[in-house]
UniProtKB/Swiss-Prot annotation:
InterPro entries xrefs: TAB_Glycosyltransferase (IPR053391), TagA_TarA (IPR034714), WecG_TagA_CpsF (IPR004629)
Catalytic activity: UDP-N-acetyl-alpha-D-mannosamine + N-acetyl-alpha-D-glucosaminyl-di-trans,octa-cis-undecaprenyl diphosphate = N-acetyl-beta-D-mannosaminyl-(1->4)-N-acetyl-alpha-D-glucosaminyl di-trans,octa-cis-undecaprenyl diphosphate + UDP + H(+)
Biological pathway: Cell wall biogenesis; poly(ribitol phosphate) teichoic acid biosynthesis
Taxonomic lineage of the native organism: Bacteria, Bacillati, Bacillota, Bacilli, Bacillales
Enzyme class: transferase
Phenotype upon loss of function: Not essential. No teichoic acid in cell walls.
Keywords in alphabetical order: Cell wall biogenesis/degradation, Glycosyltransferase, Teichoic acid biosynthesis, Transferase
Record GO terms (molecular function): hexosyltransferase activity; N-acetylglucosaminyldiphosphoundecaprenol N-acetyl-beta-D-mannosaminyltransferase activity
Family designation: Belongs to the glycosyltransferase 26 family. TagA/TarA subfamily.
Stated name of the protein: N-acetylglucosaminyldiphosphoundecaprenol N-acetyl-beta-D-mannosaminyltransferase
Amino acid sequence: MTVEERSNTAKVDILGVDFDNTTMLQMVENIKTFFANQSTNNLFIVTANPEIVNYATTHQAYLELINQASYIVADGTGVVKASHRLKQPLAHRIPGIELMDECLKIAHVNHQKVFLLGATNEVVEAAQYALQQRYPNISFAHHHGYIDLEDETVVKRIKLFKPDYIFVGMGFPKQEEWIMTHENQFESTVMMGVGGSLEVFAGAKKRAPYIFRKLNIEWIYRALIDWKRIGRLKSIPIFMYKIAKAKRKIKKAK
């Protein structure tokens, strides 16, 4: 099958990435409606933060790829703040890990199947174990994320499992590239890149304390506890510069 066409939700263009101006509650309803309609297409959800937007601005193929998603939601306060600066305010930030958890709640109620693809074998096994304890009505299966994009062996295994959800935790751009490379081999499936969420569910990494999330500075906490992320912080000022440049361009056009 193929990916559901872009939703008719109002769009907000942030440096070429077409975000859906939606809320967590609306996204939950969208996912429930997708299953209720029994569509044979797939629902591809991208949760984009400033780092992803930055990457997309310099990688045209990736930009075109994610703009084909059924929904693109703002995973990052930087994206929401940028939308306000550009006078196209997004309604809410929708953290990917929280949207994944909402999907799992739906799957639990409906006794659905979930495939976890990503991280190391040890981490994805631990994530599945932890989630199985929390959501016993879900049928889980998993595979580590250290595979080539063209690896058909894993695809065949997933097809045999017939999941309702495939959560891909390979990090961008690989997770979105994997989804769009293989999505036509699945049907009636919600597919979403979830970055490091599997590591959080596995207990290998901790999510930021509530106060960091409340203040919308979760990214600072992640950088403080994971030195590998320090180098990635440079994407924040680059993103801010690009937004300022886009704002000046809009002013000149008026």
